[in-house]
A protein has these predicted regions:
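An N-terminal, well-structured beta->alpha segment
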Residues: 1-70
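N-terminal loops that bind phosphate or other acidic moieties
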Residues: 12, 62-63, 92, 113, ...
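A glycine/threonine-rich phosphate-anchoring loop and its flanking beta-alpha core
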Residues: 16, 118-197
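Short, solvent-exposed amphipathic alpha-helical segments in soluble enzyme
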Residues: 34, 56-60, 115, 158-161, ...
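Conserved acidic residues
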Residues: 38, 96-98, 179
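Conserved beta-strand elements of the Class I
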Residues: 41-42, 97-99, 143
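N-terminal small/polar loop signature for handling phosphorylated ligands or for N-terminal nucleophile
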Residues: 49-122
Length: 197
């Protein structure tokens, strides 16, 4: 009699193996070598954080002498409330680079926080209607690392947000384009067939 591992356990094992083999993208070296960054705020979602997907990025940054603060309290669609929760850490830590690691929600959060870093009182609903209200940020670089294969958010000027009434709002501005966009196949190995659908 040969035991068969349940599908859920097999999937969990495959995800754990993929995550354990992750290494940080080589392009991250530019943050210290070229941009001379000292403080990074890393934005990801709880699922990726708990799976350890962002850990190689954090390790690489710290190895380069860059201090790292992490924020991962965001929902499936990043909300205004999520962003308000991140503002104290953003303003206290004063990063010179904001990194988003994940899918559209984490990358949208990173983009929106870049705009709020310049103007913490920015009316996001008004900015969604008028892109001219979105300020350019000279306080921090934006780096986006895709950890899914569906949205293309790592190369787009859009941030998809949910307002306080549950309505979807989309920020759009060239100022939300990243300084560095990283698409690394290693960072999608953790995805399951169900996760891609």
């Amino acid at each position: 009699h040969i035991g068969v591992m349940p599908k859920s356990e097999t999937t969990k094992l495959l995800v754990e193996q993929a995550v354990s083999q992750l290494s940080a993208p080589v392009a991250l070296r530019e943050l210290s070598d070229i941009y001379h960054c000292n403080r990074a705020l890393l934005i990801t979602d709880p699922k990726l954080y708990l799976a350890g997907v962002a850990a190689p990025v954090v390790d690489q940054l710290r190895h380069q002498g860059i201090r790292v603060a992490e924020y991962f309290t965001i929902g499936e669609t990043v909300s205004y409330e999520d962003l308000r929760g991140a503002l104290p850490k953003l303003n206290e830590f004063q990063p010179d680079v904001i990194l988003g690691v994940g899918g559209e929600n984490a990358l949208s959060a990173a983009k929106a926080l870049l705009a709020l870093y310049v103007d913490s009182e920015l009316d996001l609903t008004a900015a969604a209607d008028d892109s001219h209200l979105i300020p350019a940020c000279d306080k921090a670089k934006l780096v986006l690392i895709a950890a899914d294969c569906t949205s293309g958010a790592q190369t787009s000027p859009f941030a998809v947000l949910k307002d306080d009434e549950g309505e979807i709002r989309v920020l759009k501005s060239i100022y939300l384009l990243p300084e560095l966009s990283i698409t690394d196949a290693d960072f999608t190995q953790w995805l399951t067939a169900e996760g891609i659908k």
